[in-house]
Amino acid sequence: MGYQATIKKQGLLAIFDIKGDASAVAKRLSKLGFSVPENKNMAVEKNGQHLCWIGETQWLLLAPAEKEAQLLDSLVPHDPALDCRVVLVSDAYSFFSVRGNQADDILAIASPLDIRRINFPDNAASYTELFGIRGLVLRRQNGYSIAVERSYADMVSVYFNKVLTGKG
């Protein structure tokens, strides 16, 4: 049994792990024209960049790779007095896109996350388990973006292929 979906490994992204209270993070990101999402486990998008609120005091900023140096200069000024931490983690993650009419079915096999739209609406973002490992799931138009630690990317790719083709 095959599914009406496509799964593709994505190219590199600039990824920043940001930790701190919401007011400190909002202040830091205001320089980029971002405001933090109104609710946890949600993302906001601006100019192809996505800010995901993924924990009580944790955010991820995802941006095109070519913006990494510019964002690093803006987000990590040489001022240790600021009360949030920003760590560049671009090399830590690999991203996959899962798109198509049956993207929900694919994700339901890969993860125990309740992806019904009432619980996981457009622009939702959450860490969950994917094939037994920790992964980030972002609801996108017609599907999902999924991030896993880079060392697991080949394994996750094989698992996704087995699910997609029904061979495994």
Residue ranges and their predicted role:
Residues 1-168:
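Basic, glycine/lysine-rich polyanion-binding surfaces/domains
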